[in-house]
A protein has these predicted regions:
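Post-HExxH zinc-binding segment in Zn-dependent metallohydrolases
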Residues: 25-79, 90, 94, 220, ...
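Bacterial Sec-dependent signal peptides at the C-terminal "C-region" and cleavage site
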Residues: 15-25
Length: 310
């Protein structure tokens, strides 16, 4: 749901995803992973969330586990998305999914030692169930992407005027972020929850494309900023994120509607109002809906949407 701004990709021709045969859509668009190191790291950051010590845990293991959570306590006060060290840890752990140690991984020595000390305990008591949960979520998401992914990917690309760099790396974890998911860029790396009920069913499809769209979030920030400056209007700071929600949500709803499926945007449950004020969802539909229909330009829509906050 959240992301660090990335550089805007250059405008290019229509993407080739629509030509991918259906059975390969998920693999072509998203590369899914269930990484024990990233799962453990995020559980410790969340002070043991999703990992209540089992009754048969030895005193030694329980003590070591509690010490690890205590070590991570200062990190738990820092933002997973905007704290540079936490981002570096996430990036470093991304590629060691199958490693039995963190040899050669360049992260804080204390973090490395804590993760290596606790990994055998985590594997013994929690990882088999967590990995199974992650892979069940991945299987369900793959099915949806296989059915609807190519068309939705093409629509997202048209909306942003880009050629997406696919596949996007997606790590699935039992605990991902307080809001369920977050994305870092350069390269685009999504981390998404397998246990958050808000990311299940068709919402998983929307939120995968929402998260990957953060690669172009800077475009929305710059567009809102330029229009607001030109008109001397102050807009809600989360407005660019609300636009990103609307684009992914509306395009997902449009694609599913073509298959006879009624779908409500993730943010239509009150999130639009929380992001940018009462009635914001109506404003987004009034201005960005015509843009997605191909009837207005982005510049026109930014100007009109910002004006609605006067």
């Amino acid at each position: 749901m959240l992301a660090r701004p990335g550089l805007l990709l250059a405008c290019a021709a229509a993407i080739v995803a629509a030509a991918v045969r259906p059975a390969a859509q998920a693999e072509a668009l998203f590369e899914f992973h269930s990484n024990p190191w990233l799962n453990l790291h995020h559980i410790l950051w969340a002070r043991g969330e999703r990992s209540a010590p089992p009754a048969d845990m030895t005193n030694a293991d329980r003590s070591a586990w509690n010490e690890g959570i205590a070590f991570y306590a200062p990190y738990a006060k820092r933002d997973l998305l905007f704290d540079e060290e936490l981002v570096k840890i996430k990036v470093a752990l991304r590629t060691v999914e199958t490693n039995t140690s963190l040899d050669g991984v360049v992260i804080d020595a204390g973090v490395k030692a804590t993760l290596e000390r606790l990994m055998p305990i985590y594997r013994k008591h929690w990882w088999p169930a967590h990995d199974r949960t992650n892979r069940e979520w991945i299987a369900a998401a793959r099915t949806l992407v296989d059915q609807y992914g190519a068309a939705l990917n093409a629509a997202i690309a048209r909306a942003y005027g880009v050629t997406p760099e696919n596949p996007v790396w997606v790590d699935v974890a039992v605990y991902a972020h307080p809001v369920g998911a977050y994305t870092t860029t350069s390269p685009t790396h999504v981390l998404i929850s397998s246990t958050d009920p808000g990311y299940s069913g068709y919402a998983a499809l929307e939120m995968l494309f929402h998260e990957r769209s953060h690669a172009w979030g800077r475009m929305l920030f710059d567009g809102v900023t330029a229009a607001a400056t030109a008109q001397g209007i102050k807009t809600p700071p989360p407005l660019p994120h609300a636009i990103l929600f609307f684009i992914a949500g509306d395009l997902t709803a449009r694609e599913l509607k073509q298959h006879g499926i009624a779908y409500k945007h993730y943010a239509e449950g009150g999130l639009y109002d929380r992001l940018c004020g009462t009635g914001c969802g109506v404003k987004l539909a009034a201005h960005w809906g015509p843009y997605l229909d191909g009837k207005r330009t982005r510049a026109e829509v930014f100007t009109a949407l910002v004006a609605s906050f006067k």
